[in-house]
């Protein structure tokens, strides 16, 4: 909303005469602002808890939206406010339901069609394009949580072009022609790399089939591995050529978005090449070449590295949370399992550093001896470390005490103290543990799934 700042300043001088749509937008922005602030900062800045503020501003936004008849509206500003309200809690059941209503409203306004009407200014056209794609980005995120098996149809996006790669300062309500797009990253970088995936699916039937194969389960024998790799390589090339040719890693937005793009590509490669999604040759075994095995391991390590970069970023790390979930657990388990066979090299050293980060940030993995999944993961980690220890001590001549990480020592101490004997099978995982790793939504662990996963 490039013109919003001026309107907010005007409204502050005459709040009694602020229009209903703008009122809804303002309260939605207040709600979004609170969601981006930590609990401690809320208490320090406003003297109230984050929960109290969220309840207050959400209620105010709902009242403001109701005053605009937002579920039957044809006003563009009201739909903008509606979208911002939903964005404040993108993975909730309410958002999942209401996003469909918002998209239908957008269709009734014609947002899904390229509008060439001479009375609509370029500025208005660009705002309509941006909102349409934002609505579908939100819908995709909601589907991934609430209805992960629902098929995404490329036709849902209409024939609208992508938003331009320009900064808000390049836009003005009176301009009659579009500005020249930038060839370097802009303020739109983060959203454009997400929208590019949808544009990729819409423009390529093959890409749509590969995407469905990756995220909704493989259809065995229907598509060659070479074709899947070719399609993923194409998306990676689009990212590099269109958005990251002139990126600057010193700029936080550039660095975070680059990590998000790398994570998206690495996650696709991991899912495509993982043995669980491939046809077995005989006796349940999956044949993989050394090159494929290396690619799979590298993809898993890259994905975990990029998640670490995003989560520990000082710049809007919350943008990364929806890209983790159970996939992150899958990648960790695969990496740790493969480390039983991979003992040396830079990539192995990086993998162990990432495993160490995992245990340091989640001490319950060591302390909770009654959680069968944590115990099994610890046993797998110790088995992998034994192979690494032998390589370091015997192959490189270093002292064991100099290279043993603290988390490994703690795992050994836990085993030697016999705490593992108190484990009861099966148990329900702690609902408050491993929030960022996606275990909080599971009522029980699917042991058949994990046993199959570890059968490498």
Annotate each PLM feature:
Residues 166, 177-182, 191, 196, ...:
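C-terminal, low-complexity intrinsically disordered regions in eukaryotic proteins
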Residues 75-83, 126-129, 191-195, 252-274, ...:
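Amphipathic alpha-helical protein-interaction segments enriched in hydrophobic
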């Amino acid at each position: 909303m490039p013109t919003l700042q001026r309107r907010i300043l005007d409204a502050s001088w005459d709040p009694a005469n602020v229009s209903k749509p703008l009122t809804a937008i303002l309260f939605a922005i207040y709600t979004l602002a609170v969601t981006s602030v930590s609990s401690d900062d809320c208490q320090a800045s406003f003297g109230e808890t984050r929960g109290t503020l969220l309840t207050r501003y959400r209620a105010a936004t709902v009242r403001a939206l109701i005053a605009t008849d937002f579920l039957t509206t044809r006003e563009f500003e009201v739909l903008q406010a509606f979208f911002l309200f939903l964005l404040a809690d993108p993975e909730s059941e309410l958002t999942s339901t209401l996003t469909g209503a918002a998209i239908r409203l957008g269709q009734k306004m014609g947002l899904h069609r390229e509008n060439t009407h001479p009375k609509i200014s370029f500025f208005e056209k660009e705002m309509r394009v941006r909102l349409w794609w934002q609505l579908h980005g939100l819908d995709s995120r909601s589907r991934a949580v609430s209805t992960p098996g629902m098929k995404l149809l490329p036709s849902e996006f209409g024939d609208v072009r992508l938003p331009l790669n320009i900064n808000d300062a390049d836009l003005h309500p009176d301009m009659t022609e579009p500005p020249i797009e930038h060839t370097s990253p802009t303020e739109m970088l983060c959203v454009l790399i997400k929208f590019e995936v949808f544009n990729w699916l819409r423009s390529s039937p093959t890409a749509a089939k590969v995407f469905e194969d990756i995220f909704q389960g493989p259809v065995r024998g229907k598509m060659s591995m070479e074709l899947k790799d070719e399609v993923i390589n194409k998306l990676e090339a689009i990212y590099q050529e269109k958005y990251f040719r002139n990126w600057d890693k010193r700029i936080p937005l550039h660095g975070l978005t680059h990590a998000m793009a790398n994570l998206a590509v690495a996650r696709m490669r991991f899912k495509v090449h993982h043995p669980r999604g491939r046809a077995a040759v005989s006796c349940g075994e999956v044949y993989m070449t050394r090159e494929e095995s290396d690619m799979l391991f590298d993809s898993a390590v890259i994905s975990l590295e990029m998640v670490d970069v995003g989560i520990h970023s000082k710049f809007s790390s919350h943008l990364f949370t929806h890209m983790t979930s159970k996939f992150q657990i899958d990648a960790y388990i695969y990496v740790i399992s493969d480390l039983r066979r991979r003992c040396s090299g830079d990539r192995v050293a990086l993998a162990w550093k990432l495993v160490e980060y995992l245990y340091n940030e989640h001490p319950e993995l060591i302390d909770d001896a009654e959680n069968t999944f944590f115990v099994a993961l610890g046993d797998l980690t110790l088995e992998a470390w034994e192979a690494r220890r032998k390589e370091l001590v015997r192959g490189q001549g270093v002292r064991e005490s100099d290279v043993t990480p603290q988390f490994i020592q703690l795992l050994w101490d836990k085993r030697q103290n016999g705490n593992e004997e108190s484990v009861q099978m099966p148990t329900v995982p702690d609902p408050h543990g491993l929030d960022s790793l996606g275990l909080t939504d599971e009522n029980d662990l699917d042991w058949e799934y994990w046993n199959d996963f570890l059968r490498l």
